[in-house]
Every structure is written in structure tokens, then in C-alpha cells.
Amino acid sequence: MKKILIGGIRLYQKYISRFTPDTCRFYPTCSAYGIEAIQTHGALKGSYLAIRRISKCHPFHKGGLDFVPPKKEKNADSEHSCKAHHHH
């Protein structure tokens, strides 16, 4: 699924985006953000992040730097702290 979504974004970049004016208000561009979000977080969460970003890309938003958030490690700290508090 990730490959299909990223492939769709790459087709957009190659065949549509290059013929439209540069209007993205963010860095990285929304399409580059979408690819990175899907690569980092998977198809579902990455698509959600990309759609959320695209919804902010309009003339009434100031734009600017907006990077994909890092992937959080699942329960890495919480398991350690829970084990530290149990005394057997």
C-alpha cells in the first residue's frame, strides 16, 4: 500500500506539479512531506499526516518549515519505568 501511495505522489510530482506555479507555502513541499510521512509512519498515519498538511496549504496560512514528526517508539520508556517500580 505504501508503494502505491508514494507512486501516486511521484506521478503527481512528475506529470502535474511541474506544470503548475510554485504555490506550496511550506518546506518541504506538501508532496515531499507526503512521501516522507508515508515512509516514516506507514500508509494510514502517513496519509493522515499528509492530508492534514495539505489542508493547511492555502493563502490564509503563513506556511513555513513543517517537518514530518519522528516515529515514536512503542512503550520503550513506559515498560522500563513500570518494571523499575515493581518489587518482587
Curated annotation (Swiss-Prot):
Keyword Cytoplasm belongs to the record: no
One CC-aspect GO term: plasma membrane
Residue spans of biased composition, Basic and acidic residues class: 69-82
Paired cysteines (S-S): none
Ranges for region Disordered: 66-88
Keyword line: Cell membrane, Membrane
Source domain of life: Bacteria
Pfam families linked to this entry: YidD
Mode of membrane association: Peripheral membrane protein
SMART domains to which the protein is assigned, alphabetical: Haemolytic
Compartment(s) where it occurs, according to its Swiss-Prot or TrEMBL record: Cell membrane
UniProt cross-references to PANTHER family, sorted A to Z: MEMBRANE PROTEIN INSERTION EFFICIENCY FACTOR-RELATED (PTHR33383:SF1)
Function: Could be involved in insertion of integral membrane proteins into the membrane.
Family that this chain belongs to: Belongs to the UPF0161 family.
Name of the molecule in the record: Putative membrane protein insertion efficiency factor
Species per Swiss-Prot/TrEMBL record: Listeria monocytogenes serotype 4b (strain F2365)
